[in-house]
């Protein structure tokens, strides 16, 4: 481990670097992450595993690779990270997940930017790894589709070497510990979108966030169909609840997608009703209302499919192919449907609790080892 020189602070001493990975019952994939991290080009850093009471061999995997293992009592990613951060004394904290495949120069490419004092945090894009199956690559293409992704930062790859940005996903980012302490780390009890909320807190404090478009983290996508849709449902649910507390992270598109399932149900009822009333003919124009009840939803569906194809074809996913682009409308539709369900669940939660942090629970979309 170590082929490059350490980045120095203003006082001439090296930054003390820590990599924090929250994990629960995912030892086999964590093993791959840690194996890659032990081969990094950057010479000195500590790996910390915040283990939320795993029932598998997570501890053994962590210790095998020389990582610091912390048994964490939390039940969400924000609190797990906070528990570990309160025990850490590093200058820089890098974050990733336990289902990534870190490039061997990942640490080097993140840490180098902190030689510039104006950089408060930096991150990079994430795409599905080449090892992912076809269905997961279809999900990646859907994540990175233009026009239809509700402002998600997954797959964001702007032009430039270091570009200002308002958010980096927690799977591929680094922060100054001083800034994290200043904002009291993650929002306690945040059940999801905790990385978005953290970046909002960092920016409220006056610090700047950047993205290095070339520092890509391969991140496994959920496979179709149940895990993929559960993930989308969780995104819609947790993001809308967080939006209630943090208005600056809210996008109008998040709310619009909440109406998507209702729109689909209405469109289906319109088509079925039109067919029934029009004697099951799609071309009979004797009653223009019945005709339009069939053809307006049908025309909108065709437009939706074509827009998804176009967005997928010009999106940022490296896994665009004839096959993955062809299936993009299906995966985009499933994402919108499930995300919309999550938004509706969030609206119910907000009516019940006001969106208070610590209420509710994430939807677990992972296949785990225990």
Language-model features: locations:
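Short aromatic/hydrophobic "clamp" motif used to bind/position activated sugar donors
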Residues: 93
